[in-house]
Design a protein with these regions (language model features):
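Hydrophobic targeting/anchoring helices
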Residues: 44, 64-65, 197-198, 208-215, ...
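Short helix-loop-beta junction
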Residues: 462-487
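Boundary/entry segment of secreted carbohydrate-active catalytic domains
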Residues: 1-20, 26-30, 159-160, 164-175, ...
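The substrate-binding groove and active-site-proximal loops of carbohydrate-active enzymes
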Residues: 6-12, 29-35, 100, 171-191, ...
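A glycine-rich, often tryptophan-bearing local segment used as a flexible ligand/cofactor-contacting loop or short
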Residues: 518-594, 599
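Catalytic domains of carbohydrate-active enzymes, especially glycoside hydrolases
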Residues: 9, 15-52, 196-213, 326, ...
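Polysaccharide-binding and catalytic clefts of secreted carbohydrate-active enzymes
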Residues: 70-328, 346, 432
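Extracellular ligand-binding/catalytic regions of CAZymes and related secreted enzymes
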Residues: 221-224, 405-438, 479, 558, ...
């Protein structure tokens, strides 16, 4: 019997008590929560619904932060580059930074915890040659070397929590005191925070789920002097520091800390940077220490008979759900924001929790819910995009956040979400507890491996960037594809030379010398031979962009013999190239009419003589294939996410694995329609991913087929 209620969480506030009850009934919600900027109405305590309470571990206690300024959370900042044109150089530290957000830390020994670097030579400037003038806010360097560039790396206190500041700016909150971020890792604040949590639980006995936001360090988010976002890294660790923590780190690793281990020439160790040993050591240290303290808080929540839920975002740095330390924390649940399929897999794939919940978009904020806004459109795109991923890796609950009052002003939106809630319940009932049919085992190979599973090519959460959408499309396509997907690192291969035998196809996607492509790892003899042996013995390798690319021993693409292509960087202009004939009548392109969208593509890619070019534009190869021993290689210049490109990737995986004969199993001839089978449950579904009706032929697991007409966005369930 189809469930009409449950698995849905809605927001509430003091001014929408009756409306909350109405929406609970209409959407079939069984849980209510508060949000940043709202309060939970006491009148709703006894509705029978599960009650979530958002709990901020690092803010909303300014009295404590002001009384203990030495334990305010800190972050590392690097000044801009300055060229010396005289014998003295002054660098103003707060240039182009929001003055109310950060405060320079002069309390701790700046000669140890700051660093002035000559960026022309890479040398550290001795502390005897610079000082900080508190009156001007400048670091004064003298003597300097003329026309050398210098930077200053320094510590600053976070005087306005970046998330609170963002919410205040977006919602135009007036007369709101900036919330100071305090450092829960430090001794006084640690003791206070544990006691503060107990007080909260004592006074909120009606709460069923404590929704931690989060444990305990904010991802890197900095605003400029105009309150605009200046720098963001959703995975950034630079705001997880303090001398107290760094001294512990030094003791554990046995070598002195340098600010440069975090600053990384100004790149702040973003996910495109190949991580240094020191930064990986720091991350491992942070994971262990954050997990220990998070477990203490979770244990307290359990002591009170309540569930502990973590919001995956905001102050989440160090939690790393795909790493071993996470399991020790004992969380009951994880909730994450759903921006697309890949962001859903970021938390739906998490193990060692009882359930996961997706907070869907749009958030009920005025940036969407205003006159002329179209929240229904945003909701449809969000749901249909995420649904592909849910069908591969189901979450157990869905929910929404923000100001319910705003959503109620859009009755069409209310009606659409009612339909989504019911569709989700039906979907969950049909697929719970079962691994969907997977046609092949695919490994995405990069420097980060499982720690950044599904986070490849993500700078800020689900935000488009012109420079990476052509690569992120691969990850998004995989999030809803019928493959068993793993994320592995080069270090994993070094640790286990037989690792690749577990997979049918390996994918390497990204620009040269980034962490996604691999850089110098590709000149490591163990790695290059392991990958070539894997393909030679029958495996598939798909390279996208500048795969396996690093200039070495006469090659830029180190797997040119596998992929059949090389990039012209000027060094091969003397060699004539004659292989330009296209062969579009290929298995990979069988569903494509017209051109393939390669996004930004790649310039100056040419094919080796024995390579089969599928598509080239103006003598620049965009897609090519090649055999290598018993295996096969596929090169693609870029592949933005679309339903058609998802089909191209699907066929590329099958072809590279020499599995063309497995195409017509749980398959739709129309690439706008997909089939997902749950063999152990004896069910399968056919889903229309578009906003238009579609016709297709559906193939079942035994190869039999039937024609099908589908309405817009429709999902149909069948017994096997």
């Amino acid at each position: 019997m189809e469930q009409k209620k449950g698995r849905v969480t809605i927001p509430t506030n003091l001014d929408v008590v009756k409306e909350t009850l109405d929406i609970m009934n209409e959407w079939g919600a069984d849980a209510i929560r508060d949000c940043d900027g709202t309060e939970f109405p006491q009148e709703l305590k006894d509705t029978g619904a599960k009650i979530y309470a958002t709990y901020y571990t690092t803010r909303k206690d300014n009295a404590w932060a002001k009384a203990n300024p030495d334990e305010i959370q800190q972050m590392y900042i690097m000044s801009s580059f300055h060229t010396a044109t005289s014998d003295k150089l002054e660098i103003h530290l707060m240039d182009h930074l929001y003055p109310d957000m950060l405060k320079v830390n002069t309390r701790d020994d700046i000669t140890k915890w700051w660093e002035v670097i000559d960026r022309t030579t890479g040398e550290v400037v001795p502390a005897s040659q610079w000082h900080y003038d508190e009156t001007s806010g400048n670091v004064v360097i003298t003597p300097v070397k003329l026309f050398h560039e210098y930077t200053v790396s320094f510590l600053a206190y976070i005087m306005w929590d970046p998330v609170h500041m963002y919410n205040a700016v977006v919602n135009d909150w007036k007369d709101v005191e900036p919330q100071i971020t305090f450092d829960v890792r430090q001794p006084k604040t640690r003791a206070h925070s544990l006691e503060r949590l107990r007080r909260f639980l004592d006074t909120h006995q009606y709460v069923d789920v404590v929704r931690f936001t989060t444990f305990f360090h904010q991802f890197t988010l900095i605003f400029d002097e105009l309150a605009r976002e200046k720098y963001v890294d959703w995975f950034g660790y630079s705001a997880s520091v303090s001398p107290y923590v760094l001294k512990q780190f030094e003791k554990e690793v046995g070598y002195p800390f340098r600010p440069e281990y975090i600053i990384d020439q100004g790149y702040m160790n973003n996910t495109y940077r190949i991580p240094s040993k020191e930064f990986k050591d720091f991350q491992a240290f942070q994971r262990r220490e954050v997990a220990k303290l998070a477990k203490e808080m979770v244990d307290i929540v359990h002591e009170y008979g309540k569930e502990a839920m973590m919001f995956m975002g905001d102050h989440w740095i160090g939690m790393e759900p795909f790493m071993d330390e996470f399991a020790s924390i004992g969380l009951d649940a994880v909730v994450g924001s759903v921006g697309n399929g890949a962001t859903l897999r970021l938390f739906s794939d998490i193990k060692n929790v009882k359930y996961t919940e997706g907070r869907f978009l749009p958030y009920f904020f005025p940036d969407t819910f205003h006159e002329g806004g179209d929240p229904v459109k945003e909701a449809k795109v969000n749901w249909v995009t995420a649904r592909r991923a849910i069908l591969r890796s189901p979450i157990q609950r869905i929910g929404y956040g923000g100001y319910l009052k705003l959503a109620l002003q859009f009755p069409d939106f209310v009606q659409y979400i009612k339909e989504v809630c019911q569709e989700f319940r039906t979907l969950y009932d049909n697929i719970q507890g079962v691994t969907p049919y997977c046609v092949k085992r695919v490994a995405v190979l990069n420097c980060w491996g499982r720690m950044r599973s599904w986070g490849n090519h993500m700078v800020h959460h689900a935000i488009y960037y012109k420079q990476n959408y052509s690569y992120f499309g691969i990850i998004e396509a995989l999030s809803g594809a019928p493959f068993d997907v793993s994320f592995i690192s080069f270090d994993d291969i070094l640790a286990d030379k037989d690792l690749l035998k577990k997979f049918d196809v390996v994918i390497n996607v990204g620009d040269a010398d980034t962490a996604q492509s691999g850089g110098e790892y590709w000149v490591n003899e163990t790695i290059i031979t392991a990958v070539k042996e894997f393909v030679y013995n029958g495996g598939g390798f798909i390279g996208v962009g500048e795969p396996a690319a690093h200039q070495w021993q006469g090659k830029f693409f180190q797997l040119d013999d596998v992929l059949g292509v090389e990039e012209e960087r000027g060094f091969n202009l003397n060699t004539d190239k004659y292989n330009w004939e296209e062969h579009r009548d290929h298995f990979i392109l069988a569903d494509v009419e017209g051109d393939v969208d390669f996004g930004e593509g790649k310039k100056n890619i040419f094919a080796l003589p024995e390579t089969r070019i599928l598509i080239q534009n103006d003598h620049e190869v965009q897609m090519a294939v090649k055999t290598f021993g018993k295996g096969r290689g596929v090169y693609i210049s870029g592949l933005p996410y679309s339903f058609r490109n998802s089909r191209v990737l699907y066929r590329a995986v099958l072809w590279s694995a020499s599995a063309e004969d497995e195409l017509n199993r749980w398959y739709s001839t129309n690439y706008n329609v997909e089939v997902h089978a749950y063999v152990k449950n004896g069910k399968y579904c056919v889903v229309n991913n578009t906003y238009e009706s579609q016709d297709t032929v559906v193939y079942k697991g035994d190869g039999s087929s039937f024609p099908l007409h589908m309405d817009a966005n429709e999902i149909k369930w069948y017994q096997i």
